[in-house]
Amino acid sequence: MKGKEEREREGGGGAVGPGAAGPGAGGGSPEKSHSAQEHKEQGNRLFGGRKYPEAAAAYGRAINRNPLVAVYYTNRALCYLKMQQHDKALADCKRALELDGQSVKAHFFLGQCQMEMENYDEAIANLQRAYNLAKEQRLNFGDDIPSALRIAKKKRWNSIEEKRINQENELHSYLTRLIMAEKERELAECRKAQQEENVDESRGRVQLAGIEAKHDKYLADMDELFSQVDEKRKKRDIPDYLCGKISFELMREPCITPSGITYDRKDIEEHLQRVGHFDPVTRSPLTQDQLIPNLAMKEVIDAFISENGWVEDY
């Protein structure tokens, strides 16, 4: 069985492999195409040895020989991804998509680049596109694309939550300053009135203490309110084990396969009808009548939904 890196380089489960030039390959002479293919195969060998800079250079030579083959760009993009050179990988993915808009690898690697560059909306869109194309083309990438999509969605959620936290902290600081400023203003006015009215010292202390207590309560109530918001936010996380392996969303009707993998029923049934009769993670043979409702998981999911009303917006 091929390892993940080899499947990525070749295109995974039936995608364009080392021996295929891919769409748009007819732009050069037979001699040039043959030479480009040799460079590509050299790049594959170097990539297999984890020599990513050398592999990228070999794919670059293939591109120089024949710049019309999308897979050369996606192979080099994967090298750049391994070297964390995301700008270069991004450019190669976009060029590959210009040559072949249906390239699963190009969308997959582009989504990974955008995720690393914290462009989460674009990353999710491209990873979802890669997943949909893989289903349409009946290519099996195992859990590679679904896993990347789950990570991108979680990172986007965390980014949104971080912004919310910063906004709440700024609001808390602003309101604290307002309350403190109002307290100082009232204290100053009270002291001035006490002097003008010649209020005795004991009565004056009581008046000032009342102002202090009032604003201290404002601060305490505000802190309690923000604390409640913070406590609710800490619970805004859907555990991975409650998410489907295909849709990456909270499961609604979990069912388990003979391999022990739990899926959302509508997603696994769609997979069996559109892609093939096998478990998408383990690749073991699977038919619809082998799906068994996971009642224990359903009970856990229902309890989670009832306790977390925000879950629909996750």
Curated annotation (Swiss-Prot):
Its EC number is 2.3.2.27. Its main location: cytoplasm. GO terms for cellular component: cytoplasm; mitochondrion; nucleus; Z disc. It is found in: Cytoplasm; Nucleus; Mitochondrion. It comes from the Eukaryota. It is an enzyme of class 2 (transferase). TPR repeats lie at residues 36-69, 70-103, 105-137. Gene3D superfamilies: 6.10.140.2020, Tetratricopeptide repeat domain (1.25.40.10), Zinc/RING finger domain, C3HC4 (zinc finger) (3.30.40.10). One of its GO terms (biological process) is protein polyubiquitination. The keyword Nucleus applies. CDD domains: RING-Ubox_CHIP (cd16654). The keyword Mitochondrion applies. It catalyses: S-ubiquitinyl-[E2 ubiquitin-conjugating enzyme]-L-cysteine + [acceptor protein]-L-lysine = [E2 ubiquitin-conjugating enzyme]-L-cysteine + N(6)-ubiquitinyl-[acceptor protein]-L-lysine. E3 ubiquitin-protein ligase which targets misfolded chaperone substrates towards proteasomal degradation. Collaborates with ATXN3 in the degradation of misfolded chaperone substrates: ATXN3 restricting the length of ubiquitin chain attached to STUB1/CHIP substrates and preventing further chain extension. The U-box domain is required for the ubiquitin protein ligase activity. Homodimer. This is E3 ubiquitin-protein ligase CHIP. The gene is STUB1.
